[in-house]
Amino acid sequence: MQASQFSAQVLDWYDKYGRKTLPWQIDKTPYKVWLSEVMLQQTQVATVIPYFERFMARFPTVTDLANAPLDEVLHLWTGLGYYARARNLHKAAQQVATLHGGKFPETFEEVAALPGVGRSTAGAILSLSLGKHFPILDGNVKRVLARCYAVSGWPGKKEEIGRAHV
């Protein structure tokens, strides 16, 4: 299957069945997309929505998150699990505040350098909020690609991921 055919089929599917009204999809900003992407790691959408809404109500900007005590961030995160994500969010927000003047970085290298942000998350932030063209290789994307292109082995293996990022 040609890449153009594949992308057309995926976009058609998204037009018919995709979610388009999630809280982080409305008025997309790098901060909102980043927050949602981190919360969605290993966590279902339905679980994330109320946490995302609470975080946005309490920390409407990355600077607000950076200036909050870590204990408050962890308290709002309670129940979401994988607390390293919350600690990394806080550290990354502090870096954005100090190194970038509170403006979320807009280059792949700068975003990927933030604590807790890997290549896929950096790609998602820049693609979904700014329309830049970077791959997003989360578990769902890897499964779809593996099925469509008959990838042998688990698509989460490092060598498969490396090929996909080429």
Task: Report each predicted region and the residues it spans.
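Catalytic cores of DNA base-excision repair glycosylases
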Residues: Q2-S4, Q9-H165
